[in-house]
A protein has these predicted regions:
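Conserved core architecture of multi-subunit DNA-directed RNA polymerases
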Residues: 1-172
């Protein structure tokens, strides 16, 4: 975690500070997203928006509703696996959209994410990302891709970076 660059943060494509917040119980990481529930929330949001726009009489109210719809959709689309939220944001999202995602806190949550990680899928996503990214993003993506490929070549699973059993040598 504390190495420079942090391999855990590099694989997650998150800043080291955010990953440290999760490990030290100050932040939450999204472990999984329920796409069906997410789509249902978006559908209900659209239908509610249409009903409220019909009942709104003045243009100012309709514009405010459109802005609110855009902001809410942006919040929902922001919920993706490995996304890290601070405590306040997590609690707000859990109250609003709790059915569409599962989040965790601590190194155990990160371990679970790494345990369920498929390196070939991540490699494919990074290759697609490299085709359409800028110079600054390209450098980070290439570092991430080289790490993923090194793990695959060496036959290393990502969850092996976590100590689950601490070896103790008894005295004398």
């Amino acid at each position: 975690l504390r190495t420079v660059p942090s391999r855990i943060a590099l694989i997650l494509a998150q800043p080291v500070g955010d990953v440290e917040k999760v490990v030290y119980f100050a932040g939450y990481v999204v472990k999984s997203v329920n796409q069906a529930a997410k789509e249902e929330i978006l559908f209900n949001l659209d239908s509610e928006f249409k009903a409220k726009v019909k009942s709104a009489t003045d243009e100012k109210t309709q514009d405010r509703l459109r802005e609110l719809l855009t902001a809410t959709k942006k919040e929902i689309e922001e919920i993706k696996p490995t996304k890290i939220f601070d405590e306040l944001t997590y609690h707000r999202y859990a109250m609003k959209y709790g059915t569409c995602f599962e989040a965790g806190i601590g190194a155990d949550a990160l371990y679970e994410i790494f345990k369920n990680m498929d390196l070939k899928v991540i490699e494919g996503e990074i290759v697609k990302q490299l085709e359409k990214c800028g110079a600054l993003e390209r450098e980070k993506a290439e570092k991430r891709l080289s790490l993923i490929r090194a793990f695959q070549i060496a036959g290393i699973r990502p969850e092996w970076m976590f100590l689950t059993t601490i070896p103790v040598i008894p005295p004398g």
